[in-house]
Amino acid sequence: MTTANQPICPSPAKWPSPAKLNLFLYITGQRADGYHQLQTLFQFLDYGDQLTIEPRDDNQIRLLTPIAGVENEQNLIVRAAKMLQKHPGNTPVPRGADISIDKCLPMGGGLGGGSSNAATVLVALNLLWQCGLTDEQLADLGLTLGADVPVFVRGHAAFAEGIGEKLQPAEPVEKWYLVIHPGVNIPTPIIFSDPELKRNTPIRPLAALLSTPYANDCEPIARKRFREVEQALSWLLEYAPSRLTGTGACVFAEFDTESSARQVLSIAPEWLHGFVARGVNVSPLHRVRSGKIESSERR
């Protein structure tokens, strides 16, 4: 019998929760239920939040670092843990956990922070609780929490269609990015409810999309409604190809080298805050998970 907070398996406690970028995003329609249909290209960043997850033997789920403005029971971290906790699985392990988060990704930034947090919890607790679910099963669970959760669960850069749930592995070039948060948070419904949002971009095959300049159909709305986004993008575009990610508010510029990205960051105006990160096609979460499994097997 284990005691509360004692690790149940030898996996270390810290788990990455990486950011993502939408390298392009096109709205191709809207369903009767209001969900928007899209085509988008997801790539991860080697930058993000970090979760510390310690199993418990009393079936309690505790978030030790509440996020301001978000009730614990509504936090995707807690919701993901409780969803997996209730899933029937062939495991004798008590399903509880203490979870804390070192949060650096902004809310309402278009970097997928909440979805990534949920995916990290699902992937980590599936291992720690010995649930034995496949990534496909975890992705199906995650989809009920948010359309972006499955791509984080599966852990590979992907071309997404439908409402974001139809994923096809992709291999975009792993560039360096300067990501800027313009100092405003944009709730997704503000963009998707705007009557001027383009909702009829023609559906195209991935090969055609990759051979044309990338764009984001949400960008004109974000620039129109949020002066901070307009100013940040106008500044970035002086130095490199730049776009909005997701529905914003973060914007990003792409570079071939880390040094060139950092050089531009070093001259950014004081009112702009950002970071430099590498685009990666295999999620840092899955790299860490593979290492934990190999470490456990060696023991």
Swiss-Prot record:
Entry's transmembrane regions: none
Catalytic activity: 4-CDP-2-C-methyl-D-erythritol + ATP = 4-CDP-2-C-methyl-D-erythritol 2-phosphate + ADP + H(+)
InterPro entries: GHMP_kinase_C_dom, GHMP_kinase_C_sf, GHMP_kinase_N_dom, IspE, Ribosomal_Su5_D2-typ_SF, Ribsml_uS5_D2-typ_fold_subgr
One GO MF term: ATP binding
Keywords, alphabetical: ATP-binding, Isoprene biosynthesis, Kinase, Nucleotide-binding, Transferase
Pathway field: Isoprenoid biosynthesis; isopentenyl diphosphate biosynthesis via DXP pathway; isopentenyl diphosphate from 1-deoxy-D-xylulose 5-phosphate: step 3/6
Source taxon at top rank: Bacteria
UniProt keyword ATP-binding present: yes
Enzyme type, top EC level: transferase
Record GO biological process: isopentenyl diphosphate biosynthetic process, methylerythritol 4-phosphate pathway; terpenoid biosynthetic process
EC number: 2.7.1.148
Active site: K20, D148
Record-stated family: Belongs to the GHMP kinase family. IspE subfamily.
Assembly description: Homodimer.
Entry function: Catalyzes the phosphorylation of the position 2 hydroxy group of 4-diphosphocytidyl-2C-methyl-D-erythritol.
NCBIfam families xref list: ispE
Protein name: 4-diphosphocytidyl-2-C-methyl-D-erythritol kinase
Organism: Yersinia pestis
Gene: ispE
